[in-house]
Amino acid sequence: MGDNLMDKVTAFGERLKIGGSEVSNKISAGVSSMSFKVKELFQGPNPTDKIVEDATTENLEEPDWDMNLEICDMINQETINSVELIRGIKKRIMMKQPRIQYLALVLLETCVKNCEKAFSEVAAERVLDEMVKLIDDPQTVVNNRNKALMLIEAWGESTSELRYLPVFEETYKSLKARGIRFPGRDNESLAPIFTPARSTPAPELNADLPQHVHEPAHIQYDVPVRSFTAEQTKEAFDIARNSIELLSTVLSSSPQHDALQDDLTTTLVQQCRQSQTTVQRIIETAGENEALLFEALNVNDELVKTLSKYEEMNKPSAPLTSHEPAMIPVAEEPDDSPIHGREESLVRKSSGVRGGFHGGGGSGDDMMDDLDEMIFGKKNGCDSSTNPDHDPKKEQSSSKNDDLIRF
């Protein structure tokens, strides 16, 4: 009895020990995660965070487009870390001040429309999760909620451009499955990821913006796209043409298998695709400059042809199948045709063949044999001199008696 009680107490103590260890591990993990978040929120801002704060400060009545586009240039020129910048925008979206949230969403939209790698950073930093939380938060103002919904809808429906990042489409479909109603998108939201430039210059655009500030509860700003200078355009065209020439040379001069597996080919293909994106943006921002538009379209056509040739060579080759040579149908003449009959009559046949063919008829064959003997000195296809039954005396007597051919 005492031993059983001790065993139960020991087992219960072990369970308490194991349970306490698990609880301790969970608490440690939770504290570590919380300390990381607290450190992230309260540590001193780095230079990138300061840039984001200046662009989304609550003192701004409207987006500072010059600053936003300058930030995009800094990302493209890699003078600032794009990961830290997107992370800083995410922090501003998480804040509860409506104006800061809205300006952060506008800055985010500007970056993804003007920076090629911004979408990858948005997906990696889980910015969409914070946007969904903003949408689900009942304290979020309607304007900010609609802005987040419009961005998610535009990205979710851009399956061709963002097919390599499925998180955008999945987030959009998840909200639709929950019955979330998306607001009607304006023309700017319906445009492609890289929106065309407006016909009005930037100063006039900013001058018109205060008129829209007084519109009720649905403030929308057009996101401008940075245009290219003459030097940038020339450099982009030169890079594109050099890439086209090199890739075409590699594909034409090397064996197909070696060309496709070569690292140089892969690098050139990537460079051509990057150049194609840049040239397409030049086309979108060309405006009324017909000479620039014409040159950009020609370069884009050359890029498309070269990349299409690479894709065609990269396709798996179909198994070779043996094909029979093509036969030309020829109509055959029936045996009883007049032509066949005339040709048949021109061929001399032996008596045995003639006899067999005509069923062993007699008089006609004898007549032909006699005619052969008179003309050729042969009978039944044999020379009379070589015939063992040949008798010259009988032949002379026969020739005297038969002056004419008997039928």
Curated annotation (Swiss-Prot):
Pfam hit, one: VHS
Return one GO MF term: ubiquitin binding
- What keywords were assigned to this record? Acetylation, Membrane, Phosphoprotein, Protein transport, Transport
Q: From the UniProt entry, list the residue stretches annotated as the region Disordered.
A: 315-407
Biological process GO terms, please?
protein transport to vacuole involved in ubiquitin-dependent protein catabolic process via the multivesicular body sorting pathway
Could you state one GO cellular component term attached to this entry?
A: membrane
Instruction: Show the ranges annotated as biased composition (Basic and acidic residues).
Output: 337-347, 388-407
Limits of the GAT domain: 228-315
Location within or outside the cell: Membrane
Q: Which residues carry this modification: N-acetylglycine?
A: 2
Bias (Gly residues): 353-364
Give the function comment from the record: Might contribute to the loading of the ESCRT machinery.
* Descriptive protein name: TOM1-like protein 1
Organism, per UniProt? Arabidopsis thaliana (Mouse-ear cress)
